[in-house]
Amino acid sequence: MAPHTEQLTRPAVRLRGLTRSFEGRTVLDGVDLDLPAGQFTALLGHSGSGKSTLLRAIAGIDHGVAGSGTLTAPGRVSVVFQDSRLLPWRRVLPNVLLGLDGEDAEERGRAALAEVGLGGRERAWPTELSGGEQQRAALARSLVREPELLLADEPFGALDALTRIKMRALLRRLWERHRPSVLLVTHDVDEAIVLADRVLVLEDGRIGLDLTVDRDGPHAHGGYRTRLLKALGVFEDAP
Ligand SMILES: Nc1ncnc2c1ncn2[C@@H]1O[C@H](COP(=O)(O)OP(=O)(O)OP(=O)(O)O)[C@@H](O)[C@H]1O
């Protein structure tokens, strides 16, 4: 069954009893979730727990997948994947502008590229960019659409450790500036804590843990890490 998606004037996600299954195997088993406007949320879970399935459902790109429940999402949604998905036969700026209307589109595209640190690379081909630069271009392509909701499916998963650190900082900076709601799917507990204000753990087809990260509160990074690892069944001090 197709998801019931209606456009809202305010950017927020609301899921009620969302189910999705593949070949009779239930992956999402009645997910209830609200994502308030402007919140940065990370989604953790074991491999195969259904994180991408949930993200694709919210993005409205899971046509043909069996399921039920209600889903409300904002009108302007951008999605970033692990690979940049830039069209190799188009230069960087046209990639960013793809499908964008308006007289000021080019100006906005250039500004977005400058914002992600790719000013001056507008005429480069995607293959001339490093992996990190390609992901920067993908972020520019997302942000130029001024999304109310940014869905990111392991956007830094294929990058080296140093580039990943820089890209995390960039994403947080862009979020602070533009304030879309963000749902970041990641395998990386530390990435989730460093970036997000709320961390969810998907478990047995539902949200098993819903943790608020209070940066100004008394809890240190390590405390959140231990709780999240425990929810994921990882006990670091076990032999
Ligand atoms: N199109 C599909 N057809 C059949 N099964 C699918 C399809 N998409 C996902 N699945 C199955 O649904 C389950 C959840 O997949 P999903 O990709 O959502 O998990 P995930 O938590 O994102 O995993 P990972 O962290 O490894 O990317 C998996 O068992 C997967 O094989």
Task: Report the location of each language-model feature.
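Conserved structural motif at the start of ABC-family nucleotide-binding domains
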Residues: V13, L28-G30
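The feature captures the beta-strand-to-loop junction immediately N-terminal to the Walker
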Residues: L44-H46
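Helix-to-loop junction immediately C-terminal to a conserved catalytic motif
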Residues: A59
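Conserved ABC ATPase signature
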Residues: W125-L129, E133
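Hydrophobic anchor residue at the start of the ABC signature
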Residues: L139
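A short, proline-enriched helix->beta-strand linker immediately N-terminal to the Walker B motif
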Residues: V144-E148
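Catalytic Walker B motif of ABC-type/P-loop ATPase nucleotide-binding domains
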Residues: L150-D153
